[in-house]
Amino acid sequence: MKNNVKRLLALILALAMSLSLFACGQKQDGKQDDVQADTTRVFTDSCGREVTVPADVQKVAVSGPLAQMVVFAIAPDKMVGVANAWDETAQAYFDEEYLSLPLLGQLYGGKGELNLETLLAAAPDVVIDVGEPKGSLAEDMDALQEQTGIPFVHIDAYLATMDETYAMLGDLLAMPNEAQGLADYCRAMYDRVKAIADSVDKANILYITGDEGLNVIAQGSYHAEVIDMLANNLAVVDEPSSKGTGNEVDMEQILNWNPAVVIFAPGSIYSTVADNENWQTIPAIRDGRYYEVPMGPYNWMGFPPSVQRILGMQWMAKVLYPDAADYDMYETTQTYFQLFYHCDLTAEQYAALTAHSLAAD
């Protein structure tokens, strides 16, 4: 992580030097730029950093996929690019203007690091990082901000406090009304599902990932927030992984855990377990209590663990405790898609999304 940021800073410095040579030739006829100072204000981010930002932010870049999802809900028209290319499933839901946004890359993790030339060419008013703070985050933000001249801010995002995340975004972007609607929704849906979780005998479950089905999302990890709230997560390990792939285990351990319900991540082995002798001995598989997480336009349970988990937790509550979760899942999904993806979900699209994801009536 540290090496990645250091490499970025070196690239920024080299690029900035080349740009400064070009700028020298422009100053003679650019005096009007000196007399038109932008109106700014100070924004305090979740790291406690006081960052000078434009009072009227119009162009936003995101540092990674978590921020991409969160910011898209409130200000899609302010985004100058995306951290990751949209998943193919997004094409059915998003307008072309959003699908064709430039690819900026991401600051932490992932396959593609931040594309500095594209970022600087996009000239954002601010770069927004959203999620769980990394150990060196404040220092990284300060260094990148100093080298690029672009404000970098971090806003914490946790499942239980997504309303606070949107309140801070609303302040930063001067969009209080839009932020309030999203914040109120996140608060109400979290509280609804938390009330369900507090009222039931929790099911013993495993969340399985990986193309061989030998990875689990362990209790206590950032990725397990929904699972740990709604169920008795049997995957207890010494060092829960912070990665979306989870912790690798063996089949013997899965058999020993003996889950009553199994949730499979998209792209895992959901479609083959019914014919696998080892898996057939597990109560969840034998009794037909196994499900695949809906995928579209993102994995509803996270990975990356962003705001879409607000929808995922409502889905998981419906799967595990249908009597307590006495809401219509199609209407619930429609509302989420309208608020966060700015699209109307058809009954046919919903049926395709949840084909392997709901208990049979």
Predicted region positions:
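C-terminal motif of bacterial Sec signal peptides marking the signal peptidase cleavage site
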Residues: L19-A23
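A short, structured surface patch at a secondary-structure boundary
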Residues: A67-A122, V126-P133, N232-A235
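Bacterial signal peptide processing site
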Residues: G25-K27
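Alpha-helical, coiled-coil/dimerization segments enriched in small aliphatic residues
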Residues: Y108, V216-T245
